[in-house]
Amino acid sequence: ICSGLVGSEMCIRDRFIAIPVDAIKSEIDSILNKISNNTLVVDLGSTKYEICKKVVDHTNRKNFLAAHPIAGTEFSGPSAATKNLFDNKVLILCETEKTDQDLLSDALKIFDLMNMNIINMDSIEHDKHIAYVSHLSHISSFMLGKTVMNKEEDQDTIYDMAGSGFESTVRLAKSSPETWASIFVENKNNIVESLNEYI
């Protein structure tokens, strides 16, 4: 991450961090150590509590904003970029009272230009709710796809038989396992609770 911006660039440019949540936790201190007072670092991970806890005592905590855009597809990487991905989508912001209000105001202007709908939420509540409405559906999709592949030796035949309902249900199983494994680990307690109720 830091090799992408060197010297004075590290100090003057705001950064949006869109990497797996375990990588955010390992890199966030280093990033915050290299910024100026006028730089805002925005994390876009799918879990919030552990990341917010990681930076709570950092001297540049005021230069950090925890955000989670509720937008995306099952695909990842630069080739999966979509022009209007964030248009009219929800953006959850956590612990905004700990962010410098001038920097926050600038960020809100950017999000407004992106036509995003802002929801403010505590990081603990975010992780609890997102376990039900996002993480649980990904686990279900991964497990359905895995179950079918393990049980059906003739995969071509079973996929020929499968209708649009099956295709829709396993669509999320195409998502990056590396990205989602770290999300599941970071939010494991809430996910276990949601799974117990689901089963």
PLM region spans:
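Single conserved hydrophobic/aromatic residue that forms the stacking wall/gate
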Residues: 1-7, 11-12
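N-terminal Rossmann-like NAD(P) cofactor-binding module of classical short-chain dehydrogenase/reductase
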Residues: 15-16, 42
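Interdomain hinge/lid region at the active-site interface
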Residues: 155-199
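Glycine-rich, N-terminal phosphate-binding loop of Rossmann-like dinucleotide-binding domains
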Residues: 18-20, 45, 95
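Rossmann-like NAD(P)(H) cofactor-binding subdomain of soluble oxidoreductases
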Residues: 27-79
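Short, conserved structural micro-motifs that define repeat-unit consensus positions
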Residues: 16-27
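Internal alpha-helical scaffold of NAD(P)-dependent oxidoreductase catalytic cores
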Residues: 85-171
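Active-site capping/gating segments
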Residues: 65-99
